[in-house]
Amino acid sequence: MLLWALLPMHAQKEALVASNDSVDTLLEKLLPEANDHLNAHMNLEFYTSAAGYFTEGTLDEAAFKINRVRLEILGSFSKDFSWHFRQSFNKYSNPHALDNLSSSIEYAYVNWKPSDKFNLTIGKQFVAMGGYEYYLNSNKVREFSDFNEYVAAYQAGLSAAFNFSPTQELVLQVTNFRSGEDEDMYVYGRPAEIAKAKVPVITTLNWNGLFADKALQFRYAASWGQQAEGRNILYLTAANVYEKGPVIAYLDVMYSRQGLDTHCIISDMQGPIVENPVTAQHTEYLSFIADFDYRFHPHWNAYIKGAYETAGVYKTNGLFEKGLYRKTWNLQACVEFFPMKGSELMIFGHLLHKGHQLTGRARALGAVAPDTQRISIGLVYTIPVF
């Protein structure tokens, strides 16, 4: 898993593989006398698996899957300016109305670093919320919590990072709240009686700190944005991490209060008995995510992971009464094998159990949520193209 050893600590800004090797890049070969700061690197990320999917212990399907293929190109063109582009081949849309980019483009930004104390990033980037699971390159996560699964993590905007010391960083970020129209974000669209937001942006204040010789790591953030006229969203997110030697352990606490149901979990509870389903309003979500990783051999790593999550409504609206609607938990166990020392090649075996408990409010809407399981083996490899 990724090491939070150095700041700045922008979420998922690390390259898929390290770029400080001794092999000349294509630019260095073509332009041997060029500026020392002119460079570029390309990485290809590949993740495939074979998995069996179960509902209440009964096999539904077993199949092979290409979970993720991503290509990134990153580099710099002067001492102070760098850039990063990344595209996923597992998701696609026509250019969205708001940011004019396909959802397949995850990164498209330029970074200006005039000093060691300050840097500025503009373009499509990662929303700088807290949480270790959220922060990790998704290549490192076999199963996300529901909370992180439904966050629109890549948005166009601007962020400024202030590094007060090698172990303390403060990030102020303003990005779009959404990429496209409201109809693209909410499962049943924006309620007709609520006007569209004129400034659909979200502002994030993020603090990253390292203590105890970097063994204790914290990543806290607060985000607030406007979803529509009179409807706002709040995120409070925190990562508490211990990383030393072969051990990585963390506890994430993630909370969101949403004027409109951005996560769509409660909105999706409306079953066939609801003739005219609508997007829920005034929803809130809370998640606790815990993980313990142990690298018991240079070629072997194992971890156990669990999450406990709740979904509720904090103010009655329409069909949705105030109160708790669902409790969810997932339990995971994974063994990872790294056959080549110093390589990003990894083979894994993973077990997942996900359980749900619906309250009477959810069942009154016709909601159904059986327990599910998954058994998977897979391969992950990040290839440094140049």
Protein language model features and the residues they cover:
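Short aromatic-enriched loop/helix-cap "lid" or pocket-rim segments at secondary-structure transitions
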Residues: 133-135, 184-185, 263
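Loop-centered beta-sheet repeat module
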Residues: 173, 177-234
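N-terminal periplasmic/intermembrane-space "pro-region" immediately following the signal or transit peptide
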Residues: 7-47, 378
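Bacterial N-terminal signal peptides
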Residues: 1-5
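Outer-membrane beta-barrel pore domains
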Residues: 14-18, 49-59, 97-98, 212-386
